[in-house]
Amino acid sequence: MLVAQKFACIKITGRASFNSSIDFKVLLNELLQKGFTTFVLDLSECSLMDSTFLGVLAGFGLKLTSANNGAQSVSIELLNLNPRITELLENLGVLHLFKLNQGTLKLPEGTETLPHNAANPTREEVTRACLDAHKTLMEINPENVPKFKEVTQFLAEDLKKLKSHD
């Protein structure tokens, strides 16, 4: 992750999936709480995103869109998306939440690399994150309800079972 002033660039490599979605969500929320206002996700090396990661990303995009109704402008840019991910975002009806860009990123002066620690979530936390992400996709675009209705029902049941074992 690269940071400077209120700018953060997060490089997503390989397959962006439910496994990395909690770390991603925690990181974005931490940066937002610290006052970062410009977010760039470098997707040049991201081969695929699953629906959970897409739901987390869309939820953050929605959160920033809502935050922009306030005084401070917050933006999220997706850099160098491959056509498959662009198509997924479009089909899920969430592409409008992001600014898209291709090419080389011009980094602000004073940019430095910042490490991020993994969250190591429990199975219950992963299940809850998956459920929340899919609910977000359905709330943003009602056309997603038939796509994810059964998934959310399964995840809700699984979450209930996990909680009852505590």
PLM feature segments, named:
Residues M1-I12, D23:
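Short beta-strand/loop segment at the start of cytosolic alpha/beta domains
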Residues F18-L27, Q33-F98:
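Amphipathic alpha-helical interaction surfaces in cytosolic regulatory modules
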Residues K99-K106:
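Short acidic-hydrophobic, aromatic-tinged amphipathic segments that line or gate anion-handling sites
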Residues E109-L162:
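Charged/polar low-complexity intrinsically disordered segments, enriched in acidic residues
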